[in-house]
Amino acid sequence: MSNESLTIIDNRTGKQYEVPISDGTIRTMDLRKIKVSDDDFGLMGYDPAFTNTASCKSRITLIDGDKGILRYRGYPIEQLAEHSNYLEVAYLILNGELPNEEQLKDWTWHITHHTFVHENIKKFVDGFHYDAHPMGMLIGTVGALSTFYPDAKNIFDAESRKKQIYRLTAKVATIAAYAYRHRMGLPYVYPDNDLSFTGNFLNMMFKTTELKYQPNPILERALEVLFILHADHEQNCSTNAMRGIGSSHVDPYSALAGAAAALYG
């Protein structure tokens, strides 16, 4: 009998079962072998709201709220918040390691070249009521992006998936800024890719009559840190919604719209 196992005695039958333990967990499918009779379906786990159920194995994010721990790919959040920018952290989450200089340059180039949205997206946002909630506008508009990029349905092609990552990382910020400007009754502002990712977001949000928006460096850095802190939150409701919807092989825009709806709750 292995030390890394759980011994279960079924008092209904008197039978004894050994269930392997791996990383502090057991597979609920291993409970299926616990039966009263051969035609019995087997024991199942019941866990309302999945409060004690892990849906997958992950090496991306570790959160321990009681101890104040947040790590992305093993890097402590304090280190990333002090020394990295948002696009570096996004690359880290996707690829497992921080980018070198050339990788960051290539990654940043691809993101900044996808910040613009189709002009018809403006008309779509214009259709919302003047006081519509920004999250409602974001959900609807991100979902609508799937109709602009039918190639996104080709989810089994690695290059196609990579292109959707570029698009979503870049365009969601533009859409969020448009939602804010719509509520404020202000004209939309085109992206300025000479600025940083967060500097450009501030530009699209707050530019007024100046020819060239120059973000306040303190505010720009504060927003950078805020984006880093919210880059990933482990297996929360919206993450599980994204994974569940994505498992049906739908395009990532539709899946992200559903995940945003879960976050909206």
Residue ranges of model-derived segments:
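Hydrophobic alpha-helical bundle cores within soluble ligand-binding/oligomerization subdomains
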Residues: 2-265
